[in-house]
Amino acid sequence: RRGSSCVSSVAERMHVKQFAKTYLDHGWKIVPLAPKSKRVTKAGWIGLEFTVEDFRDGDNIGLRSVDGLVFVDLDSPECVAFANDFLPTTPSVYGRPSKPRSKRIFKSTIPKTIAYKDSDKTTLIEIRSNHQDMAPPSIHPSGEGLAWEADLGHPAEVDAAILTRCVKLCATAAVIARHYAPPGGRHDWTLALAGTLRRRGVSEDEAILLVQTAGHWSRDDKLPDRMREVSSTYAHSEDDDEPYTGATRLKELSTGGMAETLTKLWGAAPASTSAYVLNSRGIPDARSVANITLALERLG
């Protein structure tokens, strides 16, 4: 069943021991959880191996993200909505009625959990590794039942760098959507946003998808203008006399620490001397007003 598969009554749920056997047969490691809880019932569980007989009626069950199994946890509603645009496809997907398809399993070599957060410290999306995640047929603390979107399948195998970048792009789209500029101020804001992304190694196609996805979420009725603004930024040469705007300008135009969050996500813009005015020794002239302006623009 698809679509409505997350909506199931307790009577429809397979016995937890049946699920435990299925997971073990699939080569996945399991852990008993307290009923209607994410809490592991056994102390020292990280060093233990569990079997079907370790589960009691009513227990929840966790799947361990070990042996190359990696979970992507979509925490925010934006990331739940945007995941199909940014994440690789995998057949191993589950969720609950209020957060369908919010857990996606991959095979990769990411050694530890990475959480991507907004400026208010709320988690947007996580790559979870060497941990455990509550899995079907568990009952979430909210009372909702977890269910697979379809058959378990075999998780898609994805290179660690590719999966990490895809998750980072999804988090970036969520940040942009959460702090999308109000009507009347979107032109300069988009130019500065595009410059911020470009200087941090985001490609033009990625930047267009980011702004397009966040713009749809924010009901921007002038998305074609936004796309042109992004493309115009990427059309600039780094040697242009008038450099395109970036994080410094974005800080002035955005709210909620958006520019700072993007800088934390992607890192500071790499230094480059190609557009600076050089002195007689062939190094950037520290007294040049143009150089000072460009340096400030590239700081963010």
Located regions from the model:
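Short, hydrophobic/amphipathic alpha-helical patches that form generic packing surfaces
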Residues: 22, 26, 137, 189-200, ...
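Long, compositionally biased
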Residues: 224-259
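C-terminal accessory/binding modules appended to enzymatic or scaffolding proteins
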Residues: 169-195
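Short amphipathic alpha-helical interface segments
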Residues: 55-58, 65, 202-214
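Structural motif
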Residues: 18, 57, 180-189, 201-206
